[in-house]
Amino acid sequence: EARVVDLCAGSGAIGLAVATETTCTEVWAVEKEAEPFALACQNRDAVGVPCLHLERGDATDPATLAHLDGMVDVVVTNPPYVPADEMPTQPEASADPHVALYGGSPDGTEIPARVARRALTLLRPGGVLLMEHSPSQEEAMVAIAAQLGMTDIATLPDLAGRRRFLSARAPESTKPTASVTQ
């Protein structure tokens, strides 16, 4: 049975997709904000997915899902990552609150770096992190994953060919090798 965690889950769409499209998978989704968390609960209940566990909490807090540390096969995340000077171009982003979009620093990588660090403690050795990011953050996100000691680091394109996804593996020892500072 695979264990998947969706950090910064928002409405729960990614966690729901994983839970409904795969077999023998337990999925945990974490969301900090009240409104999206309530929506994720409604979506889970509407779809009727018993293997999707929702937790309201800070995705970067070591206490959140601490019982899963070192036991997760895949962490997926679409964290707030938009750089401070960048306006989201997707029409659906216009309805999102500021806290769901912007990454907490001028280049937008502060929150993604913290999420990557937390993901590393959740992952089992060899587990995989998949994270959405801005195309402008490709080099920075690769560097962050490398600083954490992750391996098999790659960025993947979206359907338009823009490199927007980080893929990285937890090393055999899942303790971060360096502190990531922004």
Regions found by a protein language model. Give the residues of each.
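Short strand-connecting beta-turns/loops that link adjacent beta-strands
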Residues: 10, 160-161, 173
